[in-house]
């Protein structure tokens, strides 16, 4: 017994030594950008919880996907559409022959080379999606493959992608109904109509995507990321009239309650849009109403992606609070305007108490809202112990990745290795993966009793194995801890000092 205790103690010490050695090396490369980038790229990153499929692809890849689609590029707006009279060089299949046009398209479809002038970063960003929408509608499977492979190559273990596979058929269904402020009655009408067939058709779409991705997971993905998990959030277009928004929300809640691949819902499109602002409280009431009927469906909401000047000051005072208290959001996306909320300190304390994680999108906030450095609330959330995780938002349009988000956190906010490790663990702990957590606390000090010895010895006991088999979340958390062990161990070697 004494031998076993000493053995376990020595292993735990070795883990601590490896973590300390890794932290020491990390501290030594703060002013060496290339080494820092290499370190962060190799570091396990857990999950990317805020990622839109519609913005995930690089423009170059979208042009490649659409090369056989017989689409035409508008010479001034660079939007694509079917046009039988299209002449070279504006056919998608031929744009690469014109160096200037090819690069103009990439700039128009992304934030590459963007300089504020005739349009703001906000306006340029939100204008990109309509330009390549026909490609998105037809090539979601290829975009999914791109997103998954990129995540795998960045040592990401889990991806929650926002997606609307039905091309807003749910919203079109809603447009056939007059608004009824009695949400119970409106829901009943929609359920008697075509909501469930739309839900079932979406699940069939996911079956198709899964088959497409299987070739990757059976091929390079088998070695690259054998433990990778992909789940979806059904996204709702908030810049639509109330009946359409409610029909989309109902579709999302029904879908997430039926298909385990869909773990929750989110609202997308510009939060400062005309209808988004006008109907914000109503939309939160809709989400809250459906939450009571579908309590197991998780909710992440874009809230507080606003700054003074973009909307009136009165519009900055309540969005995050309504998302938390009325819509019962489990997570908040962006949360940039938190300091302008009424009773902001009380709200921060409430979010900390309820453990409502904020998905922090540093590159996105800099490009769209011009908020970065000390103007960003990331340190404010940390000060009040509100959990946060780093995410990409629209990595293709923004020309970024998750590694870059970690680098920004280090360079701009001097986050330590242990802080980064906490954010990585947060991304799985606060994910919408089902099942109990491997950890009894959100500080990652106390694993569940059945896995405590396994974590300290590095060997999976039968009891822990059985527990992990009951929980997708705990299983991914275990895999993450193993990734950290493998990542940190080499830093004990002398050549890293």
Model-derived regions: residue spans:
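Bacterial N-terminal signal peptides
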Residues: 1-8
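Sec/Tat signal peptide C-region and signal peptidase I cleavage site
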Residues: 10-14
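Metal-cofactor-binding active-site regions of metalloenzymes
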Residues: 15-497
